[in-house]
Amino acid sequence: MSTEARDTIFIGKKPLMAYVTSTLIQLANIPSVNIKARGLSIGRAVDVAQIIARKTENAGYSIGEIKIGSESLESQDGRTRNVSTIEIEVKRNQA
């Protein structure tokens, strides 16, 4: 498994706490994790990052770099659509 795959959590339709738990497990092993989402899942990605940063503040996690953008995707009817994307870095604070 590549480093890119291990340090990235893709947000979908699972319960919010499933993504929070997955991110915290990854942060126990590596110093930073990227949370990625697109379209309607962007709000969930922001919620995951905020839960980790605010609720585990004493554990030493913070939000790092945030990247926003868009991707062109072809819809089922053959038209090209632009879909918004977000990537949020959550990292362990240095002791």
Curated annotation (Swiss-Prot):
Pfam families for this protein: Alba
Alphabetized SUPFAM superfamilies for the sequence: AlbA-like (SSF82704)
Encoding gene, per UniProt annotation: albA
Record HAMAP family: AlbA (MF_01122)
InterPro entries listed in its UniProt record: Alba-like_dom_sf, DNA/RNA-bd_Alba, DNA/RNA-bd_Alba-like
Residues annotated with N6-acetyllysine modification: 13
Identification of the protein by name: DNA/RNA-binding protein Alba
GO biological process: chromosome condensation
UniProt modification remark: Acetylated. Acetylation at Lys-13 decreases DNA-binding affinity.
A Gene Ontology molecular function term of the record: RNA binding
GO CC terms of this entry: chromosome; cytoplasm
Key words of the record: Acetylation, Chromosome, Cytoplasm, DNA condensation, DNA-binding
